[in-house]
């Protein structure tokens, strides 16, 4: 203790011992931490009051400066002001080193100054808000002894007063700026007499030693003058703190060149005073962690031990310090009421959350209500109108102009009043303003005006209808996004069911909205308002929702597809189809092109939802434990989280520096784990997307991650190419266990349903089971042995065990490797059953249904299969993905499953709907003959049988044959010819099905086959580089042999001549009667990929893998023109009917139109790239064809496109269900088109008349 302080205490020891009662004083000193309970007992043990006082003072004399100041403060608080006055002169300026409290500069000097100035103490339960406190202190430093105003403003209960007190609890600030002290005045809502009383009290405090202080000021003006004299002469470097100022006129009484810090709900209160002004808004509430910290302090528990309701309470409190403190104080009294208070918050029952405290109001609704009551009468109703705004929604000024029927400037003036009074918040975006309410303000208004809400929503809709037509809103309008997002909400809330149905069942609205915001929000609205929409027509609602769900991957892309054309692909009974047809017919009259898919009745779409959340391959996707959300990850290095029912995006996280290979929800859905090629494992908060942990102990890429199934103690397992498995406890920063045993990459891991075991799969050909508690290997099953034949040495056979999945009872496990799924008994390691999926594909992933015997299997040939694991029967074949399927997973209840693919999409399928699809799938080998009123399609199906399909009626004749590789029809539909994989060729006579077989055939698979015009001769080519000419009626053969490599294709010319092209880079012209070569053109360095012949048969074109195309004359050995400019393989070409134009298509999706006479480029037809690096046209352009008048061009690639040849612009796009179209067959009148996609779906399209 300082000598001055010690002497002062000794000097007045006798007076102190005579008068003080020690018990209350010791309470203060114990709470300050300067006296112990043991010391208190020693004092209490003394017999008389005098002896107890003497013992206490003796103890204080042996302590430090902090004990002296604590004793001084205790005397003040307990009413011994005269005795405290005796000790005042001995107060040390700073505490001694032994008792120094460096917490934010809160020294004993600071405590003394604040105590003298009447600054409130810290609340018993207190958490720091360092950023805001620092911001206030910075503004106070700016005053630097000069007059000025620092304003802390914010809504009711946001902690302004606590922040103001905390800001001055700083030694450096008080010593450097306010050495004259700090004086706190609580203002509140005052009239003139109340303000005069406040001023009188302040003058008395400041002028205690002045003679004129005996007479109080008689009016506000006198008080203002006296205050000015006191502040300038006696307290020149002091800070005046005015707490809770409501009215500007109040501040005029203090406007006398002082340094003032004030708290208020109304930012504009300082508009009426002079001098520098600084403003600190308190908008943001407490974060989740701070809120939990407050609750934990109130109930005296560790944060991690708080019940699950604590997190929900913080969420419902929206960060309000007042509400968190009120709830915490109530819970301290009633510790079992967590669920009750959560329910009151959720039901907006603020009246039931009441607690007396140092705050002026016992409940939040009281605090907010007083602010609203203070508004001018003429604008109160406008504030009531804001009751219909949704939380977290920023509303443009224009919306409120529509609602109130006022000019922009008038609306902005009204709203600024609300903003100034902290009843509304404003965001400036360029020249325009957006306004929003705090969540608690929304709750307060909703509860206060509950009886008026429907009328208020109706007013909003009615005003909208006065100003706008729903589908004519343009992106340039300031308010358009608000109406697209919330018009349906206002209609539903207004009870305007008829108007809501008209809106939601309008294709115009669907088109306009999806073009701007994508389909997910619309799907959400169909789900949200299903109960209303079903009142009109539940089938129509189903039609629209299904249309959006299944076309979501198209409707979210750029360029935006023609929604009317998509609608025409819906079933004819669908309301979407009927509206699209009506609209299309109107647009056809203005010259627009639309196509009808006339054979679509046979197609059933089995997916429930298709979403495209990624810009690259999707490697994994999984359901949350409640089945409400899906998380996905992939090659674009992101983690995406979206709603499982609607596809609405919830989180978009740039998760890793390299491809993300796997993701998993924790059992309580609180966290998502991701692992990556970058060797890292990361844990994310599944609600906020914040990074919680990063683990970096694997030395190679991490392939898989999986959480335990129970939430009582969360563990995460990861497997890596470094051959190790690791177990992670989320409460620890380092790996809990590393499991050694695999000799190659760990590809997959899964905890057993009871979490006792961990199964792991590896490229070493084994499945291992590990004891989770001890992290020891319990069992190793050699999966490779199930793939060995007797003659195979084990070391020569590589078996990568791709994945595993447990049965619900935990006794069995399925594993996938190569093309087999094996069901194993974990107790005996025995094989119970196996499923063989076929030789042509490998299994990528599999999952076991939680409630039945189904397994879903992803295959490399883009297909997903559902199998009954016990009966070994395939239950379903799910086609729809356009590339490899990397992941499959059942929902927790088994009612649906998801699939994730290289094609950037995730599909959700309903298990019960995906029954065995009896439709036979077509191969892409077809031939089409167009006759006057009919077309016939000859197709090869997946059982390698032949189907003869009447295009108009859809009637099918089956011509069963095995291993068909190609087929063709004779021009007059009298015969069918086909070649097979073994090189045999056959002809079937129609309609009696008599078969003629070629006696010679080819040595390898037949690839192309064609009748001559008279149908008497059949020409075929195969992989053996020979072209065979077979007059099947006379059994005469001619063999065209000269190509050095496989013949790519051929075309018949006039006069018994034939043009063929080959992988050897040459084009040859043959006489098919003699078998001689008439012309031999060495056309390209690379493979000749296609040739086209002009209609006058004088020219032909050749395209090549060398990125060029050439135009040739049959009479000249060198090309007429070499066409350069393509940046990839030129795969196809076609002449216009008059021979003036040539179109070429390449593997980048570009089509170029050239002038044949001079070889000049006329147009480049290239669809806009969807994503950087993605091929346009959905892939390679494989076929092109001009209309007879050469005004239009149709092209085949990933889908079909029609082009305006004059402008080079796209006229229409038809998105097929699958992709990779090989060829398009076009009728002579250019009105009918036939193709087959890679899913085996046949499209017969007709131009809509």
Swiss-Prot record:
<keyword id="KW-0547">Nucleotide-binding</keyword>
<feature type="domain" description="CARD">
    <location>
        <begin position="1"/>
        <end position="90"/>
    </location>
</feature>
<dbReference type="InterPro" id="IPR001315">
    <property type="entry name" value="CARD"/>
</dbReference>
<dbReference type="GO" id="GO:0005634">
    <property type="term" value="C:nucleus"/>
</dbReference>
<feature type="repeat" description="WD 1-4">
    <location>
        <begin position="741"/>
        <end position="780"/>
    </location>
</feature>
<dbReference type="GO" id="GO:1902510">
    <property type="term" value="P:regulation of apoptotic DNA fragmentation"/>
</dbReference>
<dbReference type="GO" id="GO:0043065">
    <property type="term" value="P:positive regulation of apoptotic process"/>
</dbReference>
<dbReference type="GO" id="GO:0007420">
    <property type="term" value="P:brain development"/>
</dbReference>
<dbReference type="GO" id="GO:0071560">
    <property type="term" value="P:cellular response to transforming growth factor beta stimulus"/>
</dbReference>
<comment type="subunit">
    <text>Monomer. Oligomerizes to a heptameric ring, known as the apoptosome, upon binding of cytochrome c and dATP. Oligomeric Apaf-1 and pro-caspase-9 bind to each other via their respective NH2-terminal CARD domains. Interacts with UACA. Interacts with APIP. Interacts (via CARD and NACHT domains) with NAIP/BIRC1 (via NACHT domain). Interacts with CIAO2A.</text>
</comment>
<dbReference type="GO" id="GO:0008656">
    <property type="term" value="F:cysteine-type endopeptidase activator activity involved in apoptotic process"/>
</dbReference>
<dbReference type="GO" id="GO:0042802">
    <property type="term" value="F:identical protein binding"/>
</dbReference>
<dbReference type="GO" id="GO:0001843">
    <property type="term" value="P:neural tube closure"/>
</dbReference>
<dbReference type="InterPro" id="IPR015943">
    <property type="entry name" value="WD40/YVTN_repeat-like_dom_sf"/>
</dbReference>
<feature type="repeat" description="WD 1-1">
    <location>
        <begin position="613"/>
        <end position="652"/>
    </location>
</feature>
<feature type="repeat" description="WD 2-2">
    <location>
        <begin position="959"/>
        <end position="998"/>
    </location>
</feature>
<dbReference type="InterPro" id="IPR042197">
    <property type="entry name" value="Apaf_helical"/>
</dbReference>
<feature type="repeat" description="WD 2-5">
    <location>
        <begin position="1083"/>
        <end position="1122"/>
    </location>
</feature>
<keyword id="KW-0963">Cytoplasm</keyword>
<dbReference type="GO" id="GO:0070059">
    <property type="term" value="P:intrinsic apoptotic signaling pathway in response to endoplasmic reticulum stress"/>
</dbReference>
<dbReference type="GO" id="GO:0005737">
    <property type="term" value="C:cytoplasm"/>
</dbReference>
<feature type="repeat" description="WD 2-4">
    <location>
        <begin position="1042"/>
        <end position="1080"/>
    </location>
</feature>
<feature type="binding site">
    <location>
        <begin position="154"/>
        <end position="161"/>
    </location>
    <ligand>
        <name>ATP</name>
    </ligand>
</feature>
<keyword id="KW-0677">Repeat</keyword>
<dbReference type="GO" id="GO:0032991">
    <property type="term" value="C:protein-containing complex"/>
</dbReference>
<keyword id="KW-0053">Apoptosis</keyword>
<dbReference type="InterPro" id="IPR036388">
    <property type="entry name" value="WH-like_DNA-bd_sf"/>
</dbReference>
<dbReference type="InterPro" id="IPR041452">
    <property type="entry name" value="APAF1_C"/>
</dbReference>
<dbReference type="GO" id="GO:0051402">
    <property type="term" value="P:neuron apoptotic process"/>
</dbReference>
<feature type="repeat" description="WD 2-8">
    <location>
        <begin position="1214"/>
        <end position="1249"/>
    </location>
</feature>
<dbReference type="InterPro" id="IPR019775">
    <property type="entry name" value="WD40_repeat_CS"/>
</dbReference>
<feature type="repeat" description="WD 2-7">
    <location>
        <begin position="1176"/>
        <end position="1213"/>
    </location>
</feature>
<dbReference type="GO" id="GO:0010659">
    <property type="term" value="P:cardiac muscle cell apoptotic process"/>
</dbReference>
<dbReference type="GO" id="GO:0030900">
    <property type="term" value="P:forebrain development"/>
</dbReference>
<feature type="domain" description="NB-ARC">
    <location>
        <begin position="106"/>
        <end position="415"/>
    </location>
</feature>
<dbReference type="InterPro" id="IPR027417">
    <property type="entry name" value="P-loop_NTPase"/>
</dbReference>
<dbReference type="GO" id="GO:0043293">
    <property type="term" value="C:apoptosome"/>
</dbReference>
<feature type="repeat" description="WD 1-2">
    <location>
        <begin position="655"/>
        <end position="694"/>
    </location>
</feature>
<keyword id="KW-0853">WD repeat</keyword>
<dbReference type="GO" id="GO:0001822">
    <property type="term" value="P:kidney development"/>
</dbReference>
<dbReference type="InterPro" id="IPR048975">
    <property type="entry name" value="APAF1_WHD"/>
</dbReference>
<feature type="repeat" description="WD 1-5">
    <location>
        <begin position="796"/>
        <end position="837"/>
    </location>
</feature>
């Amino acid at each position: 203790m300082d000598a001055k302080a010690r002497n002062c205490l000794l000097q007045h020891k006798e007076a102190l011992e005579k008068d003080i009662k020690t018990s209350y004083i010791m309470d203060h000193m114990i709470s300050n931490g300067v006296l112990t309970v043991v010391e208190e007992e020693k004092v209490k043990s003394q017999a008389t009051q005098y002896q107890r006082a003497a013992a206490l003072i003796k103890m204080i004399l042996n302590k430090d400066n902090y004990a002296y100041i604590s004793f001084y403060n205790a005397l003040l608080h307990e009413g011994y002001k005269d005795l405290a006055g005796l000790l005042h002169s001995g107060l040390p300026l700073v505490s001694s080193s032994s008792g120094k409290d460096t917490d934010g500069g809160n020294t004993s000097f600071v405590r003394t100054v604040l105590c003298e100035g009447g600054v409130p103490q810290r609340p018993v339960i207190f958490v720091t808000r360092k950023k805001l406190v620092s911001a206030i202190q910075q503004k106070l430093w700016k005053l630097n002894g000069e007059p000025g105003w620092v304003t802390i403003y914010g809504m009711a209960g946001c902690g302004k007063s606590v922040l103001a007190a905390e800001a001055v609890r700083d030694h450096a600030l008080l010593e450097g700026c306010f050495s004259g002290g700090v004086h706190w005045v609580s203002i509140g809502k005052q009239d003139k007499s109340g303000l005069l009383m406040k001023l009188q009290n302040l003058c008395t405090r400041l002028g205690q030693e002045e003679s004129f202080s005996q007479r109080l000021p008689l009016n506000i003006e006198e008080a203002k003058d006296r205050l000015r004299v006191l502040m300038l002469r006696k307290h020149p470097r002091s800070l005046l703190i005015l707490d809770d100022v409501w009215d500007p006129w109040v501040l005029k009484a203090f406007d006398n060149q002082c340094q003032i810090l004030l708290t208020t709900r109304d930012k504009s209160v300082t508009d009426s005073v002079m001098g520098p002004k600084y403003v600190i808004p308190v908008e943001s509430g407490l974060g989740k962690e701070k809120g939990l910290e407050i609750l934990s302090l109130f109930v005296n528990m560790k944060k991690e031990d708080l019940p699950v309701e604590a997190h929900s309470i913080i969420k419902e409190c929206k960060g309000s310090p007042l509400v968190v403190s009120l709830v915490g104080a109530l819970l301290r009294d009633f510790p079992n009421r967590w669920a009750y208070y959560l329910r009151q918050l959720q039901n907006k029952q603020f009246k039931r959350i009441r607690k007396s405290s140092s705050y002026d109001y016992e409940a939040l609704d009281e605090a907010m209500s007083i602010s609203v009551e203070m508004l001018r009468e003429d604008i109160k109703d406008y504030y009531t109108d804001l009751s219909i705004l949704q939380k977290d929604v920023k509303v443009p000024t224009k919306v409120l102009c529509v609602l109130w029927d006022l000019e922009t400037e008038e609306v902005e003036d009204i709203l600024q009043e609300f903003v100034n009074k902290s009843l509304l918040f404003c965001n400036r975006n360029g020249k325009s303003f957006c306004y929003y309410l705090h969540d608690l303000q929304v709750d307060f208004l909703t509860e206060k005006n509950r009886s008026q809400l429907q009328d208020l929503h109706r007013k909003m809709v009615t005003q909208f209808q006065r100003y706008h037509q729903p589908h004519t809103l343009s992106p340039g309008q300031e308010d358009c996004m608000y109406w697209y997002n919330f018009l349906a909400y206002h209609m539903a809330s207004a009870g305007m069911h008829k108007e809501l149905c008209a809106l939601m069942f309008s294709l115009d609205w669907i088109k306009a909205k999806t073009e701007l915001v994508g389909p997910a929000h619309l799907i959400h609205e169909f789900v949200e308002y299903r109960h209303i929409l079903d009142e009109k027509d539940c089938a129509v609602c189903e039609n629209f929702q299904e249309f959006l769900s299944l076309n979501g991957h198209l409707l979210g892309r750029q360029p935006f597809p023609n929604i009317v054309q998509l609608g025409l692909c819906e079933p004819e009974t669908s309301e979407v189809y009927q509206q699209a047809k009506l609209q299309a017919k109107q647009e056809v009259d203005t010259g627009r092109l639309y196509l009808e898919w006339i054979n679509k009745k046979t197609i059933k779409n089995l997916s429930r939802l298709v979403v495209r959340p990624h810009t690259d391959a999707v490697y994994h996707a999984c359901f949350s434990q409640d089945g409400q959300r899906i998380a996905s990850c992939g090659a674009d290095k992101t983690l995406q989280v979206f709603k499982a029912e609607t596809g609405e995006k919830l989180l978009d996280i740039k998760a890793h520096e390299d491809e993300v290979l796997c993701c998993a929800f924790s059992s309580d859905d609180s966290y998502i784990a991701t692992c990556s090629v970058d060797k890292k494992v990361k844990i994310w908060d599944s609600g906020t997307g914040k990074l919680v942990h990063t683990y970096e102990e694997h030395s190679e890429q991490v392939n898989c991650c999986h959480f335990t199934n129970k939430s009582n103690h969360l563990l995460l397992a990861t497997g890596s190419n470094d051959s190790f498995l690791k177990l992670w406890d989320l409460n620890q920063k380092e790996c809990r266990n590393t499991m050694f045993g695999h000799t190659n990459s760990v590809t997959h891991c899964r905890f057993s349903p009871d979490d006792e075991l961990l199964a792991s799969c590896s490229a070493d050909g084994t499945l291992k089971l590990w004891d989770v508690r001890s992290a020891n290997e319990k069992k190793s099953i050699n999966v490779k042995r199930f793939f060995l034949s007797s003659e195979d040495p084990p070391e020569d056979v590589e078996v990568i065990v791709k994945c595993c999945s447990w049965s619900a009872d935990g006794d069995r496990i399925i594993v996938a490797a190569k093309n087999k799924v094996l069901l194993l008994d974990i107790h005996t390691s025995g094989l119970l059953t196996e499923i063989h999926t076929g030789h042509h594909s490998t299994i990528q992933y599999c999952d076991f249904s939680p409630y039945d015997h189904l397994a879903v299997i992803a295959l490399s040939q883009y297909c997903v299969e559902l199998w009954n694991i016990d009966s070994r029967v395939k239950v379903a074949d799910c086609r729809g993905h356009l590339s490899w399927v990397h992941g499959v997973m059942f929902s927790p209840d088994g009612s649906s499953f998801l699939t994730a693919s290289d094609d950037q999409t995730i599909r959700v399928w309903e298990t019960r709907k995906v029954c065995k699809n009896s439709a036979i799938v077509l191969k892409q080998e077809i031939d089409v003959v167009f006759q006057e009123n009919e077309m016939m399609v000859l197709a090869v199906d997946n059982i390698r049988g032949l189907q003869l399909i009447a295009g108009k009626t859809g009637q099918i004749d089956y011509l069963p044959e095995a291993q068909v590789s190609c087929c063709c029809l004779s021009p007059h539909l009298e015969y069918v010819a086909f070649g097979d994989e073994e090189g045999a060729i056959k002809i079937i006579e129609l309609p009696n099905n008599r078969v003629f077989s070629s006696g010679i055939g080819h040595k390898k698979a037949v690839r192309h086959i064609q009748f001559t015009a008279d149908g008497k001769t059949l020409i075929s080519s195969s992989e053996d580089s020979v072209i065979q000419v077979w007059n099947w009626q006379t059994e005469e053969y001619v063999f065209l042999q000269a190509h050095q490599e496989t013949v790519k294709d051929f075309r018949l010319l006039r006069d018994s001549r034939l043009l063929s092209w080959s992988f050897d880079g040459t084009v040859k012209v043959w006489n098919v009667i003699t078998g001689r070569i008439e012309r031999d053109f060495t056309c390209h360095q690379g493979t000749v990929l296609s040739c086209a012949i002009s209609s006058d048969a004088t020219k032909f074109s050749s395209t090549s893998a060398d990125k060029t195309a050439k135009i040739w004359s049959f009479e000249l050995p060198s090309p007429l023109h070499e066409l350069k400019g393509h940046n990839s393989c030129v795969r196809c070409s076609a002449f216009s009917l008059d021979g003036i134009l040539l179109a070429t298509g390449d593997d980048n999706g570009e089509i170029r139109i050239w002038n044949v006479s001079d070889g000049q480029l006329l147009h480049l037809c290239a669809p806009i790239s969807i994503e950087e690096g993605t091929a346009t046209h959905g892939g390679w352009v494989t076929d092109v064809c001009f209309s007879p008048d050469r005004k239009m061009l149709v092209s085949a690639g990933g889908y079909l496109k029609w082009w305006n040849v004059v402008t080079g612009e796209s006229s229409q796009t038809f998105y097929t269900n699958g992709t990779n179209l090989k060829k398009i067959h076009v009728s002579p009148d250019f009105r009918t088109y036939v193709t087959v996609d890679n899913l085996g779906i046949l499209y017969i399209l007709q131009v809509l008349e």
